[in-house]
Each structure stands twice: as structure tokens, then as C-alpha cells.
């Protein structure tokens, strides 16, 4: 700290006293300051602190009129040696000046010594005055940080007004006494003097709040505890230091003067807002030191450039040795030094240039995708950045696009390649001019002119070689009419042999003819149509039909060309229209017709719409802009289908008749109409069965056949079998006679039944009267177990029959009605349940028979008793044989 003091007994002291005398006589006086101090002051003891800025702002010269005191810049007053205040007061003046003598101030300071009082003890018998306790007024006090002592050092004295009447004992408590830090303060209980036992670090403890107590000998406290605030005055014992040990800034090269580079910051642990923490920054050294490029603001620490001549290519890094000092940068302030690094960012301020001004190379003709040359460039900018990466351009000589130049990403070289064949017969040498730039845009340095593009010349020599045919041009266009019939010839594709400049010896072949329209003459290359040319074919795009032709020489070398057949439109398609029309009555009563014409625009619209006379009573047809027409109802029609014939013509009168199927529907939109369109209504179901459906049908049919066969077997086995004859038919119906001749002729049946059809043994038969003539249906009476069959075939007149056959016929005529009746009645009993059980009596039944009665009841009881067929008697066998023979 800057402390100005007078040393007695020296020449300087005399001059200083003279100067003080002048200041005292001519300076203005400020407000007087009074300080209460102990009567005994030791050397280097802080007496107090005054506010100098209230008297004079930023004084550059501070002097004391009393050599026993020195004053710091912050207003702190220190003693220079031990002092004993003999009188109660001692005064001196602080003289302030701005350094140039233009303004001077004087500040009066008065020191008052504290008086010692005589205490007496309070007697217990003395009455206690009835008064309320008072709170002591706190006494301000401060401690100097890092005080050198001697210790214990007197700090303050507390006294109670009750000491005038009683003997008071004093005590203190709080931080520094009975709390951390312990035993830093103590008090003399009799006098109230407070002492400090050791030095204090303000950065650790900036103040102490201690409570003082005043009590009598018997423990009575006449006053409230007194709060004592001991503030530790800062001592400039901490040097500032930079916040970061390693600081790196970057700034673009060629930047303008005054460009901010960065800001350095430092920290001082001393008391903020004081001179101890007022920091100043300074650049001590720049490495390299010439020329000077940087400066720093002393208060903010902001580093800026002082020149626009920063060039990364000359020096890419600078180091600055910095100093930060407290006490406002005064020489006696504490300081610290540090080093920061400033890196220059690259800018594209250097153009690339070729290492050679010209190059020569060669290449064979007709070679493609081959590298022919590499060119090297230099660039002083930072490698592998857009500022140094080269971009090559062919400026001249590549009008046909035969060459391409690229950049090798690894070496930054320019690579020249041939991408399109060169022809030795056309040109034997090509000269190229190539330029180079950087990927990044060029940045001009200060006061510098923009550079020009660096260029070089490349001479490419073309080497001759025996080559195949050339297809030039690659695409040839010929014209043809739409609808050209088959068998017509067209000019084809012609290739040339560059060695002979003719097409002799070449053979042609088509490799691309999508719709097979043409055939090619292998010698001349001309085309012949094999189909009718149709411009509306799906293979025709934009009126063009493409054909690929290959020309091959005798050595097998070939070239490929494309022949484009440009078809001229022909009016061969009438206008077409959608024949299904829907009119939604809820929305509108008309439909918009929009025909299309597959021909070109010259053979298309405007269209002319004509309505057939048969539909004019119900409909009107109005043309709209030649492309559309409106079909409108003359009046609201019923919801139904209507056929409307119309005719549409294109601009050349080519027309076609159409029958529209108009669906008048109750709907808002056609999709809501539930009436099926005509095509859907008339369409036959088109059902295609898959393999699984067919397999399912086959398996289902097989299963159904199995079920039917099973039912047939069960029914055949269990159903009721109607017997054709009872078991005793032979004995009951044959008359015993000794003659073989015919019996007595019977002309009428004993029982007459109406002619009817009865089911006997599941065979239809006609039952008539006995002796009736006519044709009889063949009948078969089959005995299952006997193996014999009784048959009746178609016969003629009974009179013409043989005698034996006549007897059999009479027997059959007699028994058949009766058997039919019985079968009929049994059937009625089975179905309607109205037949009664009865027994038919006969006059003669002959020998007993195993078959029993022929009544319906016995027949029902023995439906399946066919065992008698196994033991037929001889008479029945004879009759059966007779019946079988015919």
C-alpha cells in the first residue's frame, strides 16, 4: 500500500513539512472525523478508517500532518510507533491532492481517549432499584487482518451504566470465544477490556458476532446482553491469479484491426470492492515479439488485434505473457503472471497453382474410361481443408465432352480421363486448357487484389488403331405413315467403316423390335414391314417406335445404332365413349358425355354429336366446346334402363354409332345407385373353380354315393317282401285229376274287381276279368330260393292257345285277381290301418301245407319264412317246369 509519512531529522522531512504547510494554508477543509481510541496505542495499530472519497474522489497524494500516523489509500489510519494519549484528545490533519495541484482537500481527525472508572461492589442489603433492563448500545469495532501483534492485542472495552452503583463483572461468548475458532478473544472481567490473542485471516473469518454480559457478584444482570460485531479489516495478503491455467484463443487470419480475440479473467480473494481487489491487466511479452499484433484492456482483460496483418502462413500461433496486479496496478500491488496462446484460423487467402505450365500426353482412339494424365498443384493454405482442396475445370478444348477431370481426394491431384471415344480420322491432337480453384471461396487479404485462376495447357495426342464400324449418328429418325401395310420398304440404318469410309462388307441385324413390325435386309440395312404400322400401339411412345440395329464387319467388330420410326397420324380411329351412363335424379337431370379419340390432335376434336330420331322424344343432346356433350331428359323419366343411340364425328367427319345404356336412378351420386349396370345385369356368371374346390366336390360326391349305397343295402335287407304266391299255392289252386287234358272252360271270373293297377312283388300289372282278350304285360314271379321263374309273356287270343297253356291261363286268370285283392288289402292295412284280421274258409284245401293259410294275417306273420322253397314237392316242381317252358 502507498503510505506517505514524514521521517524527522532528514532533508526530505523538511521539504515535506514545507509542502504540508503550503497545503494547510491553501486547501479546503472537509468534515471533521472523531475516533475513540484507547489511551495507549502501540505501533502499527489500526486506529480507524475514514472515507476519503467523500472529501476528494480518486486522490493521488495522501499525507498526514502528524508523523505518528500513516494513512492508506482506502482511508485506514495506522500508528507508526507507540503512543500514549496524555490528554483526552489528540488531533491531526489528512491532506489530499489530485497530483497536479489543481485541487487540494484537508480532513481533520480527532482521537478521543477512553476514561477509566472506579468500580465498587454492590452490597446485598442495598435495595434493588425497580427499573427495567436496558439494552446497551453496540460499539463498532474492527480488527486488522494478519496483525503482527504484540498479542494479546487490546480490541475494545465495554462498560455498563450499572457500574456507577454496583461492582460489575464482564464476560463474553460466541464465535472466537467458546465457539470456533476457540480462545481468539477474551475479556477482563473487572475492566471490560477485550483482547485478541492471535492474528486473523479475513478470507476465513470476515467478522465475529460476540455477546457481552454485565453481572453483579451475586449473578444479577442489570442489562441485556450486548451484541458486539468485530469486523475484520482486509489486508492485501492475496495476490490475484488467472482463472484458468491454460488459455487458448483463436482468431481468423487477415482479420480487421480491433477484432476481439478473447477475454482473460483473474480472481483475488481479498475483500471485493476495495483497492485490494482492483485488478489491472497488462501484456508483458508477445512471442514472437515482432510485429506487435495484440493489446489488452487493463480493466476488462479483453484482448484485441492492433493490425490487420495476421498471416497464418507466416506464423500460425502466438503466445502472450500476461500480468494481473491488484491495488489498481500500483507498483506495490500484488501480481501474478500467466501465458495464453492465440491460434490463427486459416482463411482461403492463397490460390492453388500448377507445378507445370504445360503437359503432354497421348491416348488411343476409341478408348473410354481411361486415365491419361495427373496434374499436381500447390496451395499454402491449411492442408485437407476446403481452403486447400483443388477443384479442376476444363476451360477450353472439351466442346465434344470427350474428357473429364476429377480431384484425387488423397493427393489433391487433378486426374484427366477420356469418357467419350476419340477419332483419329477426325482429329489427331486435342489441346485443353485447365484451370484450378479451391472448394472454399477466396478471401481477400486487407488491401489486396483478388487473384486470377491459375491455368495450364494439356496437349492430348491421339494414336491410330484398326477399329470396327461406326454407327453415326447413334440415333437416326425416319418417317412413316400410320397404318402402313405389310410388305412396304423403308430406309434403314447405315453404318460406316472409318478405315474405308464406306459401308461395304457390313452386315446388319435387328436386336430390338418390340412388336416385330419389321424385318431387316442384312446387306443394305433397309427395313420391310411385316405388320400394319399402328400409331396407337402400346409400343409407340410420342409417335415414335424404336428399333435397335447392330452393324458387324468381317472381323466380328460391331456397333449399335437406334432407328426411330416417326409415325404420322392417320385418322383410323373414330371417337369412343363409355356406353354406361347414370343419371341421378336427386342431383341433376342430365349426364356429361366425354368421348376420346385415339388419333392425334389433328384427327380428334372438335366433335359433333348427333342424337337418333327414335330417342329425340325423351332426350336432348347439346354439344359443349366441341369436346363434351350433355345428354338431358326432356321430362322426368321413370327409374329404369334406357337405350339411347347417338353418333359422334371427329373434325374430319369420321364417326361411329354408339348405343348408350342410360340408367335413371333415385340417387345423389352414381355410386349410391342400387340398380345394376347393364353389363353386370347381362353378364353370365363367370365362376372358376380352384383345385381345392374341385377336390372337395369329388370327395363330397364319393361320400354321397357311399351313403346312398349303404341306405340301399339296408333297405333291401330289412324291407317287407311281398310274396307272389302263398306256400301252398300248388295244393290250393290245382285240382286233383287223373287226366292231363284241359279242364272245364270257364268264361267268367268268380270274383270281379274293377280294373286297377296293383303292386305285386314291386312289378306293375293290369288286372282284368277272366277270359278277357288283349295284350298282357310281361310279368315275372321269382322264387328266391327255388331258382324258378313263372313268366307270362305277351299273348294273343285265348282260343288259339294250346290246351296245356289254356289250362294254365285259366288258373292264372282265376288266382290273379284274388292275389291282387289280398295284396291290395294288405297294403291298405299297412298304410291306413283299417283292415281287419280275418280267416278265409275254403271248401277244399287238400293236403296240409307247410305254407299255411293265404290270409293277409298269416302272410304278415310269415313275411320272411321262405324256408319252404328248399323242400318243394314233386308236383310243384312239375308245375314250375311247365310254366317255365314256353
Swiss-Prot record:
GO BP field: desmosome maintenance; establishment of skin barrier; hair follicle morphogenesis; homophilic cell adhesion via plasma membrane adhesion molecules; negative regulation of epithelial cell proliferation
PROSITE patterns named among the record's database cross-references: CADHERIN_1, CADHERIN_2
Quaternary state and interactors: Binds to JUP/plakoglobin.
Annotated protein name in UniProt: Desmocollin-1
Membrane topology category: Single-pass type I membrane protein
Membrane-traversing stretches: 692-714
Entry text on domains: Calcium may be bound by the cadherin-like repeats.
Tissue specificity remark: Expressed in the epidermis and inner root sheaths of hair follicles (at protein level).
Regions of this protein lying in the Extracellular compartment: 135-691
Residues annotated with Phosphothreonine modification: 385
Cytoplasmic face residues: 715-886
Source organism, top-level taxon: Eukaryota
Organism: Mus musculus (Mouse)
GO CC terms of this entry: desmosome; plasma membrane
Molecular function per GO: calcium ion binding
Cellular compartment(s): Cell membrane; Cell junction, Desmosome
Keyword terms: Calcium, Cell adhesion, Cell junction, Cell membrane, Cleavage on pair of basic residues, Glycoprotein, Membrane, Phosphoprotein, Repeat, Signal, Transmembrane, Transmembrane helix
Propeptide residues per the UniProt entry: 30-134
Keyword Lipid biosynthesis: no
